[in-house]
Structure formats: C-alpha cells, structure tokens
Amino acid sequence: LDYHEPEGIVGFIKDMNKSCEAVTDVISFQGESDGISVEGAFQYINEFHENVLGFCNNIYNAEGGTHLTGFKTQFTTIINSYARELNILKEKDQNFTGPDVRNGMTAVISIKHPDPRFEGQTKTKLDNQDAAKVVAKVVGEELTRFFDRNLETLKAVIGCAEKAAKIRKTEERAKTNMLTKQKFSFDSNGKLANCESKDASKCEIFIVEGDSAGGSAKTARNRQYQAI
C-alpha cells in the first residue's frame, strides 16, 4: 500500500488548511547545502495559532528540533528586516516576536540528513546543529528572493504579525494593570476603608472587630493617613 501526494508538502498544507480562510497562497522553497537537502512550504490562514511541523528523512519529529529552530529564527529575522525596510516598524518600535510572526502560519519543513541524530529513542526531536544552520541558510536565500518579487504576499504576512503583536501588547497591559491594582489593594472582602495617602511611611492601619466598632472608627479616623 503506497501513500502518495502528487504536490508533496504543498498538497499536505493545502489539505490541512482546506476548511480555513486563506490569507496567502502556499509558498514553497527548497535548497541544499553541506549534503543536507531542505524542502519547505508555508501558508497563512485567518486563525490565531501556528502549526509548524518538522520531518527528517521522512520521520515526523513531534517535538521539533534544530531544523525548526533554524526555520523559525531565520523567518522572524527576515520579516522584522522587511518591516523596518518598509517603515512598518518605526525606529522606536520593538521587533515582532517569533510567535507574532508565525501567527496564522501553517508550515512544513522537511530535510534529508546523511547522519541524523535524535533526542530519545522515539526520534521525536532532531538534535543535529548543522541542520539549523543549513535550514537558516536556505530559508534566508530563498525567501528573500521570493519576498523581493512578491510584495503583496510580504505585506499580508507582516499584517498577520502586526495583528498578533497588537493583541499581545493589549494582554500584557491588562496583566500589568491587574498586578498594579493587586499591589496597592489590601482589601479582599470589601471591608477595607483605605486612606488617601500613598506614602507608606506616614500611614497606619487599624484592625477592629465588628461592624459597630468599624463604623465608629471610620467616623473618627483621619482619612488622609489612617485606614480601617
């Protein structure tokens, strides 16, 4: 019994994304260096997750490995470089993160290595350091050539990164605000009558038992410096 996909990994990606809204076409590339051959393809869809798969000598590496590290690192570098060149990222702006750049990406990286090394018995993670270098080299050369000739596709990819970065920054601000509020709030049950001053060296807190005592203390306190 033979399993055959006429379009190779391009067809594989099309099949994975067949029920999704495409943002780009499937982009494929290939190359070879130092006896290691690299074949890759990717497509962006209108989703907020990434799906990047790695294979070495037709073995699926469920935990990824150095070939995926090379791809991800180089791809992020390329997109940030173009984003600055196109003035989409200003001088004051931080670079997109790797997850930003891969937002909505489905990708497959397949290499052929003459002497593959894996972590563990199950071959779920590739461990060859030269694989990262070769994949990065091929990705850098081939995708730079592609994006130079396909500006609209490049802008669509950068648009996905911008959207992810905006969401990430919004979530970070919300988390920071929540932590800041928790830092300055000691009231866990709604019964703290806080003082107005934020200078801890001048403030004091009184702990009283019962609502009656609490009410009297609140009336008599100095609101500027005394909390009940």
Language model: regions and residue ranges:
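GHKL-family ATPase ATP-binding module
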Residues: 1-228
